[in-house]
Amino acid sequence: MRPEESAREKIDELLSLAGWSVQDLERFNLKSSLGVAIREFPIESGYADYALFVDGKLVGLSEAKPEGMTLSGVAEQTERYSSSIPEKFHIKGENVRFLYESTGVETFFRDKKDPSPRSRRVFAFHRPETLKE
């Protein structure tokens, strides 16, 4: 198993523990749970590793990286991906608000509505009800 595949397995488990229903793009159901995490979600510039939907609305993205990778540099990639979300998924004319980078061992998070948004380490993914607007 490649290191990134191992990280994705751990991230799937972390998302599930936080109350997310982790689903594949080919057979997802946004109504199956308050929070749905879709793997390999298409965006204008490629694919986001995870798209996080709460109540059917796209609220966040998460990028998966192999264990041992420094996540601080990945924040720029996640930011770029958040800027290439198709407009039909924008909420109130705004782009995705919550961004994560994770190795499955270490997870960073930022809220783009913070006055000075910056990534910070968190111990777990937020629960869907916490991210509900």
Q: What feature does the model see in each segment?
A:
Residues 1-133:
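Accessory nucleic-acid engagement/destabilization modules that flank
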